[in-house]
Design a protein with these regions (language model features):
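Alpha/beta-hydrolase-fold enzymes
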Residues: 147-234
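Active-site glycine-rich loops that stabilize anionic/oxyanionic intermediates
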Residues: 64-67
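An N-terminal hydrophobic leader/cap segment in hydrolases
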Residues: 1-38, 44-48
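Alpha/beta-hydrolase active-site loop
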Residues: 107-127
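Catalytic active-site module of serine/aspartate enzymes centered on a nucleophile-bearing elbow/loop
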Residues: 296-332
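Short beta-strand/loop motif that positions the catalytic acidic residue
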Residues: 260, 266-268, 272
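Conserved alpha/beta-hydrolase
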Residues: 69, 76-102
């Protein structure tokens, strides 16, 4: 189905694979540029972008835990169709960016400040020079939503609007070995910092759609097939250091949300088994100009929901980008 107002084509469950092959894959080869840059501490970062010939609007994507560029092919193509230049950064330790540990399945940082530095370097060195004068939008999903919140608090003038999709602002430890996670958060033994946390699970080469964060099976299989093809996409569990860093980052993101000055849209999944809504509500209440909406029928990855929920999600996003945040209806 094509939305004439925003010039974008929505792909259903039945035609997703064919549309990706026929429309998105050629776009990736013809329009997307890839490259590397260095973060502030010299870590090598992989990035991707496509400059829209219409120019004037740019969106930067900050991905979630264990994610990589290939998971966002459809999302980036949708924004490109709507007239946006699109930029994607693979944070340190993810995808083809440099890792801090040798295990390709382990996710480790000492502090989320490292991710903030990655985003700053990407914006300053790559995005801004290519898009001067554009309206700049920040899009953060899950872990990327937490990183985006912190970035907006520290650098309130980099972006004009921001979208947080299922932002990781309060984790649901009840469904993820919470006692062991709590142990990893309070442990400060230096020799454990870069070691797998007690909740670490190695990459499983067998697909498990039923327990995934996707409601759309063809979208799940699209990204999972990429995971199987390269061990660079096998990141699957956190270190002790990452877990402690995430806990501190979520607390800071909520505490300083009042420093966010730009219009902010927070989108919640109705059936989110990874993050709790409380932290999202607190950020929405404290930020100066925020709207929050729950998308019925969606799981954690709302952009991978079934057709009805997914189209509502996009309708809310593009409406937000075109209108003042005060005009977007709130939902419970």
């Amino acid at each position: 189905m094509t939305n004439e107002k925003w010039k974008i084509a929505f792909y259903g469950e039945e035609d997703f694979a064919a549309r990706m092959k026929g429309n998105v894959t050629p776009w990736l080869y013809q329009n997307v540029v890839s490259g590397t840059t260095l973060s502030l501490d010299g870590i090598r970062l992989q990035y991707y972008y496509a400059l829209n010939p219409e120019r004037g609007k740019t969106i930067t994507f900050i991905h979630g835990f264990g994610e990589f560029f290939g998971k966002y092919h459809e999302v980036m193509h949708l924004f490109y169709q709507a007239g946006y230049s699109v930029f994607f950064l693979e944070l340190r330790g993810f995808g083809r960016s440099q890792r801090l540990v040798s295990d390709p399945e382990l996710i480790h940082v000492n502090s989320f400040n490292e991710y903030i530095d990655d985003v700053f370097a990407f914006q300053y060195q790559i995005v801004q020079p290519l898009t001067r004068g554009d309206v700049h939008i920040l899009f953060g999903h899950s872990m990327g939503g937490c990183i985006s919140t912190l970035f907006l608090e520290r650098f309130p003038k980099f972006f004009d609007k921001a979208i947080l999709s299922s932002p990781m602002l309060e984790l649901d430890f009840r469904t993820s070995d919470w006692k062991l996670q709590a142990l990893s958060m309070i442990s400060t033994a230096p020799n454990l910092n870069a070691k797998p946390s007690p909740s670490f699970r190695p990459f499983n080469p067998k697909p498990d759609f039923a327990h995934s964060s996707c409601a759309s099976e063809p979208r799940y299989m699209y990204q999972f097939s990429q995971r199987l093809a390269s061990d660079k996409y096998h990141t699957s569990g956190s270190s002790y250091g990452w877990t402690r860093a995430a806990y501190a980052a979520m607390q800071e993101a909520i505490a300083y949300a009042g420093d966010i000055r730009i219009p902010l849209l927070i989108l919640q999944a109705e059936h989110d088994h990874l993050v709790l809504p409380g932290g999202q509500q607190q950020v929405a209440q404290r930020a100066r100009n925020a709207a929050i909406m729950k998308i019925p029928g969606s799981k954690h990855e709302i952009f991978n929901a079934l057709t009805e929920a997914r189209e509502l999600y996009w309708q809310v996003i593009f409406t937000f980008l075109e209108t003042p945040v005060s005009e977007i209806p709130a939902a419970g």
